[in-house]
């Protein structure tokens, strides 16, 4: 078994010796390039996930603000109901004049 391992090691050494320095440099550069590309892909995927997460948070905040705005508009509409204004005017012995009512947006 040890002889077989030794023979395999010798075969690999012989094959490596067969390659010239240029070929070794070429294969080394391919390996380094492959490694750099793999690391870059992982980095970009991580950044993409972070951006998607940030986008989701911002969209949630936008929806929350829209809901707050809709609630505020609803409250303004409820406060400007004609019946409510008449009740307030009557309770303070005032006369309701519709020309003096303005809606702020």
From Swiss-Prot:
It comes from Streptococcus pneumoniae (strain ATCC BAA-255 / R6). Residues 46-105 are extracellular. It is found in: Cell membrane. The chain crosses the membrane at residues 25-45. GO terms for biological process: FtsZ-dependent cytokinesis. It is a single-pass type II membrane protein. The keyword Cell division applies. Essential cell division protein. Keywords: Cell cycle, Cell division, Cell membrane, Membrane, Transmembrane, Transmembrane helix. This is Cell division protein FtsL. Residues 1-24 are cytoplasmic. Belongs to the FtsL family. GO terms for cellular component: cell division site; plasma membrane. The keyword Cell cycle applies.
